[in-house]
């Protein structure tokens, strides 16, 4: 039983209340975000992405700030509670007729169970995040092959075309089935071997432009921050909806950038061609 004592501690109580408050806070932010996104034209992916990401960070910071505030009020409460337990006759308890605007006190008896589930969940999701990150970083070290000289020359021209100052790395990889961009300071683009058999030069360049758009937008870093927030807020359905929207709009942002730099027909054909190897594997 000693192992579960923390679940009944003031700190666990503060965490449990923070989880409940987070659901209420995120519902308000979700509702505002949903309304705003509905009012924005479908073609404005950059604006939708910025609004969604900002809303998600507000939810995350609200959770952290609420938890810090709740924990900061614990020392006085804990000392007073212990003193009252030792000398109950020396204290008079005043009951106020007023109540806070939003109170979850009627759920207090469920908080130990709620906190236990949250801690188990965050350990699992943190482990999964760390594992996926390590697996991703290993991709840039194993099963790599250099591009042919003509494709490498095309790639370097595209890098200059979209004003990326430092050439990222690019390789064929035997470990993947779709293009991947990895890294922030030293980004690397990995391409599946099958891609060379299904794409024309123009289609190949369109796919490269999509990955270069991710590099130009520094999406790997922003996605990593988002993934950490996903781990903290794994319990929150309103946060999950916004996080899903962020990922969808991120891809649309890159698609819009590609359409500015290349022919829409070739890009559409390249996306269709990429589906062929995956369908054959299924």
Residue ranges and their predicted role:
Residues 1-2, 82-102:
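Low-complexity, acidic polar-rich segments
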